[in-house]
Amino acid sequence: MMSTSSDAQLDPVEFIHSRIRTVPNWPQPGVMFRDITPLLQSAKAMRVLVDLFVERYVDAKLDYIAGLDARGFIIAPIVAYELSVGFVPIRKVGKLPYKTQRESYALEYGTATVEIHEDACKPGDRVVIVDDLIATGGTMMAGKNLLDRLGAVVVEGAAIVDLPDLGGSALLRGAGLSLYTVTEFAGH
């Protein structure tokens, strides 16, 4: 991580990139975990990050920002608040109390399922999906599929970090989802 004395010399994207810590061999050997907690611990970095998202979507005529469980919940509601739009949680299965739609997706070992309240948005609502990171793209694709099923217009998927070598961003773009990511890291 760079020292704060050099922060003024960095552009916003470089500044955000410099606040993401790489943790080797976590949660398992061979994985280079991209840890956003140092970014979250800095009020300045949070402001820069939120401003990047807000500037991107201020004129997009959105109805909602959807956040993916769990780290998407950190940034998405803040961006929704700043844009004066609603927030839609897309949760891990079994966490929402009302009637839901579910979508399962493949993980490296097994499957996972996310769900959304069936009345979370209505046909034609314009939504951006936000998460912390795009790796394999499975969670964001599941979120897109859920929103599509509700009739929403998924304007874009957005994340702080893209890990393009894992193929998720290519998969999502190949499925017709426009993407915005603040920064990217090579490798896993």
Curated annotation (Swiss-Prot):
EC number(s) given by UniProt: 2.4.2.7
Record-stated family: Belongs to the purine/pyrimidine phosphoribosyltransferase family.
GO MF, one annotated term: adenine binding
GO biological process, one term: adenine salvage
Biological or metabolic pathway of the protein: Purine metabolism; AMP biosynthesis via salvage pathway; AMP from adenine: step 1/1
Recorded superkingdom: Bacteria
Function, in words: Catalyzes a salvage reaction resulting in the formation of AMP, that is energically less costly than de novo synthesis.
Native source organism of the sequence: Burkholderia thailandensis (strain ATCC 700388 / DSM 13276 / CCUG 48851 / CIP 106301 / E264)
Catalytic reaction annotation: AMP + diphosphate = 5-phospho-alpha-D-ribose 1-diphosphate + adenine
Membrane spanning residue stretches: none
Pfam family, one: Pribosyltran
Assembly information from the UniProt record: Homodimer.
Class of this enzyme: transferase
Recorded GO CC terms: cytoplasm
Subcellular location(s) per record: Cytoplasm
Keywords carried by this UniProt record: Cytoplasm, Glycosyltransferase, Purine salvage, Transferase
PANTHER family found in the cross-reference section: ADENINE PHOSPHORIBOSYLTRANSFERASE
Official protein name in the record: Adenine phosphoribosyltransferase
